């Protein structure tokens, strides 16, 4: 190839190729599909979540954004819970992101707090138990989405375990990012107003025909499988407990010379006091004891009410 010929070779514009192959659409077309999906969320999701939580959850369309998928996800910011989902015969890889404040408020409501009395929580990463509680919420969003799209076969969506945005792996620079759209919805519980986003490749949205099914989720009084799953998640969530016993005070000189096999007595001669904690929070005042061949602690007092302890464990 001559120098003059090489100088006339130009790389194809990536956006142009994406438009030619159906991977990028006009904002007007994408916006129309986003609005249709938002109308289904607005129509069905409040009823689904109200029947599960007993709370009046408000849903409203907050607009849409377009761009590269990884950039749209990064723009959600910190304090967001993310989930990777797929729906056979519709989209093999899409994401849902939800601001943490409304999920924290939902946990408070499930623990018995009046939604109207919940103060707006600050965005933060969620604990393992809070994520356990949030998982069925992601299932609810996915189920409403399933009712809205034309996915043949009636397959159920696959919802990966949600994770905090700070834990999301960095994109592989070798893999080319895809053009996507973020459908943004506000979700309100009491005075707490947050946003959840559904991020879908534009190639999928351009082929999507939205079908509204008004009958879905109309029975708000029925205790559904979603509720049972939520309760089971909470019941089966394991909590690591720690016990702390005060030992006899030692001088710095003695402490520095301790060797393997040396014994340090408990501070309390009788009724040895044990502080039991979880997630860095003191929960119970206990008494050290023994049952058969196992050492145990007996609860003697609590640090707060049952609701206080649950909130400490969940946070």
UniProtKB/Swiss-Prot annotation:
Localization of this protein: Cell inner membrane; Bacterial flagellum basal body
Query: What is the membrane topology here?
Result: Peripheral membrane protein
Does Cell inner membrane show up as a keyword for this record? yes
Under the heading InterPro entries, the entry gives: CheC-like_sf (IPR028976), FliN-like_C (IPR001543), SpoA-like_sf (IPR036429)
Could you list this entry's UniProt keywords, alphabetically sorted: Bacterial flagellum, Cell inner membrane, Cell membrane, Chemotaxis, Flagellar rotation, Membrane
Q: Name one GO biological process term.
A: bacterial-type flagellum-dependent swarming motility
- Look up the domain of life of the source: Bacteria
Please provide one cellular component term from the Gene Ontology annotations of this protein: plasma membrane
Which family, according to UniProt? Belongs to the FliM family.
The job of this chain, per UniProt, is described as: FliM is one of three proteins (FliG, FliN, FliM) that forms the rotor-mounted switch complex (C ring), located at the base of the basal body. This complex interacts with the CheY and CheZ chemotaxis proteins, in addition to contacting components of the motor that determine the direction of flagellar rotation.
Q: Which protein are we looking at?
A: Flagellar motor switch protein FliM
Annotated organism of origin: Rhizobium meliloti (strain 1021)
Q: Recall the taxonomic lineage recorded for the source organism.
A: Bacteria, Pseudomonadati, Pseudomonadota, Alphaproteobacteria, Hyphomicrobiales
């Amino acid at each position: 190839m001559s120098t003059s010929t090489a100088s006339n070779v130009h790389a194809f514009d990536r956006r142009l190729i994406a438009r030619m192959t159906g991977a990028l659409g006009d904002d007007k077309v994408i916006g129309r599909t986003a609005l249709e999906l938002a109308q289904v969320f607005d129509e069905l999701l409040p009823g689904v979540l109200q029947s599960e939580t007993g709370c009046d959850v408000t849903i409203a369309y907050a607009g849409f954004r377009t761009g590269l998928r990884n950039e749209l996800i990064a723009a959600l910011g910190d304090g967001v819970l993310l989930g990777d989902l797929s729906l056979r015969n519709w989209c093999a890889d899409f994401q849902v992101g939800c601001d943490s404040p409304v999920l924290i408020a939902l946990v408070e409501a499930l623990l018995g707090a009046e939604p109207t009395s919940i103060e707006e929580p600050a965005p933060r990463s969620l604990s393992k138990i809070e994520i356990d509680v949030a998982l069925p919420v992601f299932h609810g969003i996915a189920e409403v989405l399933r009712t809205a799209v034309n996915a043949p076969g009636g397959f159920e969506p696959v919802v990966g375990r949600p994770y905090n945005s700070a834990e999301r792996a960095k994109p592989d620079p070798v893999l080319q990012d895809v053009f996507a759209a973020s459908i943004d919805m506000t979700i309100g519980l009491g005075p707490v107003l947050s946003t959840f986003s559904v991020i879908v490749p534009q190639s999928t949205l351009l082929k999507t025909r939205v079908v509204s099914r008004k009958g879905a989720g109309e029975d708000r009084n029925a205790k559904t499988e979603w509720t049972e799953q939520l309760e089971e998640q909470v019941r089966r969530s394991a909590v690591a407990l720690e016990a702390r016993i005060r030992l006899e005070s030692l001088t710095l000189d003695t402490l520095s010379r301790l060797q393997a096999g040396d014994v340090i007595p408990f501070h309390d001669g009788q009724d040895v006091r044990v502080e039991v904690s979880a997630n860095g929070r003191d929960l119970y005042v206990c008494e050290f004891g023994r049952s058969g061949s196992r050492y145990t602690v007996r609860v003697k007092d609590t640090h707060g009410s049952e609701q206080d302890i649950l909130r400490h464990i969940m946070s």
